[in-house]
């Protein structure tokens, strides 16, 4: 695979203090983001924590907390006015102190909910006891922490535990040294081997996912060959023989992205199913790695969508919706937002593959409301995807004006993500204008879309044929337009089995759109009829 596709730029590290000095707006100020992310109970806990643990002079940060909390947008000038006697330099120090105190409060509040926090707390206690010279007490806590770490497969944590055990044993003989030394050496080697394999597989999964986020599906044989080559060169020789949870998780994720990039949707389905089944076989890990479980369910739904497994899609979505209402999700901001985004996306997909576009429109207001509520915490990529799906919902329902509004949000977004989505947003934008009969701008739009897609190396024969048709369609008499559409449909159907030519179908059902023009029926009606004829429809 070309090195440029998998090159990671190292971001210059910036100090904690400098982050506060360069945060002029709502989306950038990290203290503002943190305070706005807090639930009522978390704010209440912080106030109690700070009053118990701080000196009177430190209570000024409570004033700062309240001032920031009341802001709709971060404004430093307004903030300084609300804190009379505070200089700009003092404000930076106060903000840094407040930020740390909020995190300390959250750590206390959330420790029971996080295995990682619990393990680190135990390690801190063991280290304190070691420094006090209470070696046996320290080792006792380390033993308990090791047991918890092994149960929850937290092998990275074991490295620092074993390192402290070795330090205690080497500097302060506490047990049968020879037997203990041999055991610790074996443990250290075992953990090191395990961590190395997990690191290699997680790197592979992350790099493949990064490629997809940047480019989307493989555009041509060159892309496919480079992905296959990269996978072959970086997949550890004995990866398929691994039995550990994390080894299997990252192995399945690697093959998931590998298959998805190549549009091998059957392989994609097999590995997303393995990903989810891994959690089902070890239910404890759903709590430990909730984020990965949620992502697995999302990808399994996508696989059912790509294969039009209507029944399995419906049952998986129902299971995912039930999980989204569990305390584990509802009590965690990140999981609640993740499940909302993925379930919203899945519900739109369900309407798109069944042709019930109009029935899906009532979903949009709530999605918009939640996106506005979560705007500080939803990544740009996810917003692009949701906006595109909403645009397709309006396109399929025949509301081309609103479809264009949503596509403009993508076209005007300059985030360096998903070249493929940018290309197909422009193509659907062009089709929407065609449907509206905006003849005066079609030719210039065709040229613009053609240039953009060619530049991004996203132009296939199908897109070329569609663009060619659109460019000349308004010069064709109404009597001759139907034969021209039938000709175009035949040319595209001929290419239906070529994965690189039909990647457009992952973004818009071009064939159903053309069939609707030829038969003079709605696109919704065409897709609904296909659904009703499917053996895999919901019964």
Protein language model features and the residues they cover:
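Helix-turn-helix repeat elements of alpha-solenoid scaffolds
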Residues: 96-100, 133-143, 174-186, 218-234, ...
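Alpha-solenoid helical-repeat scaffolds
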Residues: 197-315
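"A position-specific structural signal for the A-helix of alpha-solenoid helical repeats
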Residues: 117-120, 124, 157-160, 164, ...
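Residue-level signature for tetratricopeptide repeat
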Residues: 128-129, 168, 257-261, 303, ...
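Alpha-solenoid helical repeat architecture
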Residues: 153-160, 195-202, 242-249, 284-295, ...
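Flexible inter-repeat linkers and adjacent short helices
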Residues: 3-5, 9-230, 240-242, 477-539
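Active-site/pore-lining binding-face segments in mid-to-C-terminal subdomains
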Residues: 412-481
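Amphipathic alpha-helical segments of tetratricopeptide repeats
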Residues: 143-150, 185-193, 229-240, 273-285, ...
